């Protein structure tokens, strides 16, 4: 026994990670290239086709003058800007290197060996990685019609449950849980179980019955909401995210995060991006127009499309072979979609809403694929 009373790991010929780490399948991002194709339309990572705000780009360029200086470890200017934008308490805001970092830190802080973390069967892959990294046990619950099922989550809760992750809207399905259901989940969970609401795509949702969950953070000691600057704000390369949490949770995160986990350029650029609401409004309008158009046009070709409230669509095919054939056909034209077999959806591809040019090319490409298939089948 060690001084702490725990059993030491068996000796080995080399340093060994704990068993949870060895059970992790490394995250594989969407493709970004197609060999032999001159022009690429990357529609695999849910990046905004409008790019970042011009004001954000100016702020990023200006930040080069301070590259030799450490950033403000508390990200005070950014937390203040976020609080002002959403009417929040800045003391409850914690910033991170993308919301991925915060999702992982929450597991590291609140989950340990022998304890369980819950997520849904087609939920974001990072949840499982975070749970295993913390030494916890991942518990996967079924969805209903590709949508988070509150009753299934509650049925999976045990005395060992410590954390529940839900993506709302969900990636890669694009479905969402109405606020009434999210509230029911928050109210029904034991008070010692942390509910993490991942609202990475929340800015795109225009449904009246949706909420990212800020209200629940204010009224529950066990609810955290995470957001990112990677999607609608167009700052994916800077790795910038934030969460709104109860004071005790924010305090715990601030104890374990890196002292300078948010870079100076990211802070400055994030502040400028928040201030340019006109750019965000344009991004929302563009998405509303083309999300609807893509769904209708692709549906006319006979492919099933899951209704989405985010900036992407889940396309369904006859089987995995057809999904792979469509993926290869479109890739040959420089149209890069996301295979989602790793999410348990081998018969599907995820399509990011792109520029007008890219969107029209995708539909034209699918039409040509259908024609080629008809010829082959005689």
From Swiss-Prot:
Enzymatic reactions: L-histidinol phosphate + 2-oxoglutarate = 3-(imidazol-4-yl)-2-oxopropyl phosphate + L-glutamate
N6-(pyridoxal phosphate)lysine PTM sites in chain numbering: 231
InterPro entries: Aminotransferase_I/II_large, HisP_aminotrans, HistidinolP_aminotransfase, PyrdxlP-dep_Trfase, PyrdxlP-dep_Trfase_major, PyrdxlP-dep_Trfase_small
GO biological process: L-histidine biosynthetic process
Membrane-crossing residue ranges in chain numbering: none
Keyword Endoplasmic reticulum appears in the UniProt entry: no
Protein EC: 2.6.1.9
Pfam families: Aminotran_1_2
Pathway(s): Amino-acid biosynthesis; L-histidine biosynthesis; L-histidine from 5-phospho-alpha-D-ribose 1-diphosphate: step 7/9
Class of enzymatic activity (EC top level): transferase
SUPFAM superfamilies: PLP-dependent transferases
Cofactor(s) listed in the protein's UniProt record: pyridoxal 5'-phosphate
An MF annotation (GO) of this entry: histidinol-phosphate transaminase activity
Keywords, in A-Z order: Amino-acid biosynthesis, Aminotransferase, Histidine biosynthesis, Pyridoxal phosphate, Transferase
Homology family: Belongs to the class-II pyridoxal-phosphate-dependent aminotransferase family. Histidinol-phosphate aminotransferase subfamily.
PANTHER family, sorted: HISTIDINOL-PHOSPHATE AMINOTRANSFERASE, HISTIDINOL-PHOSPHATE AMINOTRANSFERASE 2
Subunit structure as annotated in this protein's UniProt entry: Homodimer.
Official protein name in the record: Histidinol-phosphate aminotransferase
UniProt source species: Beijerinckia indica subsp. indica (strain ATCC 9039 / DSM 1715 / NCIMB 8712)
């Amino acid at each position: 026994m060690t001084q702490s009373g725990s059993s030491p790991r068996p000796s080995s010929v080399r340093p060994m990670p704990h068993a949870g780490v060895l059970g992790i399948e490394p995250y594989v991002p969407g493709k970004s290239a197609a060999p032999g194709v001159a022009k690429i339309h990357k529609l695999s990572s849910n990046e905004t086709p409008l790019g970042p705000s011009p004001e954000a780009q100016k702020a990023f360029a200006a930040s080069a003058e301070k590259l030799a200086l450490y950033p403000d470890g508390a990200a005070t200017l950014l937390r203040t800007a976020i609080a002002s934008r959403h009417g929040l308490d800045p003391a409850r805001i914690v910033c991170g290197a993308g919301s991925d970092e915060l999702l992982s830190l929450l597991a590291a802080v609140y989950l340990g060996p022998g304890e369980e973390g819950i997520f849904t069967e087609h939920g974001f892959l990072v949840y499982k990685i975070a749970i295993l990294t913390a030494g916890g046990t991942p518990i996967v619950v079924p969805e209903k019609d590709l949508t988070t099922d509150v009753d299934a989550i509650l049925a999976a809760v045990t005395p060992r449950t410590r954390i529940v992750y839900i993506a709302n809207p969900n990636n890669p399905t694009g479905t969402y849980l109405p606020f009434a259901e999210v509230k029911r989940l928050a109210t029904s969970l034991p008070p010692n179980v942390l509910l993490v609401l991942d609202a990475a795509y929340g800015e795109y949702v225009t449904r009246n019955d949706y909420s990212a969950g800020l209200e629940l953070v204010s009224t529950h000691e066990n609810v955290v909401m995470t957001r990112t600057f990677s999607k609608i704000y167009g700052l994916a390369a800077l790795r910038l995210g934030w969460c709104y949490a109860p004071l005790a949770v924010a305090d715990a995160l601030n104890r374990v995060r890196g002292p300078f986990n948010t870079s100076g350029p990211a802070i400055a650029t994030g502040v400028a991006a928040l201030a340019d609401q006109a750019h965000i409004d344009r991004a929302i309008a563009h998405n509303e127009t083309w999300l609807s158009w893509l769904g209708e046009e692709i549906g006319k070709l006979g492919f099933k499309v899951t209704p989405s409230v985010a900036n992407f669509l889940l396309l369904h095919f006859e089987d995995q072979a057809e999904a792979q054939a469509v993926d290869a056909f479109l890739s040959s034209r420089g149209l890069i979609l996301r295979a989602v077999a790793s999410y348990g959806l081998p018969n599907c591809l995820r399509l990011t809403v792109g520029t007008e040019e890219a969107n029209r090319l995708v539909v034209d490409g699918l039409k040509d694929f259908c024609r080629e298939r008809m010829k082959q089948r005689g």
